């Protein structure tokens, strides 16, 4: 099993442990879009309590990648996605948070190239 496959398997297992129903195909697509950042501890996690981090998720993913208009609904969706992973959970994996956001805004049909983060595939 490749390191990438191990990461995706970890995301799938973590999502199941949390009771989140995220298709494996979507987690795989999002993880590929995140590129090498999934292997970097800090970059692979989202802090639900850090305002700067939430702004990055909003601007770099929801607005730039998913093509959504800036609104309070985006902030609420980020809060909901991080809360779904547990408020005391310190390992909020970016791939899972992003997958939850993709599902929330019904953007599952986007091509992988649309989800690429920082030019990574």
Predicted regions: what they are:
Residues 2-55:
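Core of compact, soluble alpha-helical bundle domains
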Residues 7-16, 70-89:
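Short amphipathic alpha-helical segments and their helix-coil junctions
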Residues 25, 29, 33, 76, ...:
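Amphipathic alpha-helical interaction segments
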Residues 22, 45-49, 65-73, 84-93:
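Short acidic, glycine/proline-enriched loop segments that cap or flank alpha-helices
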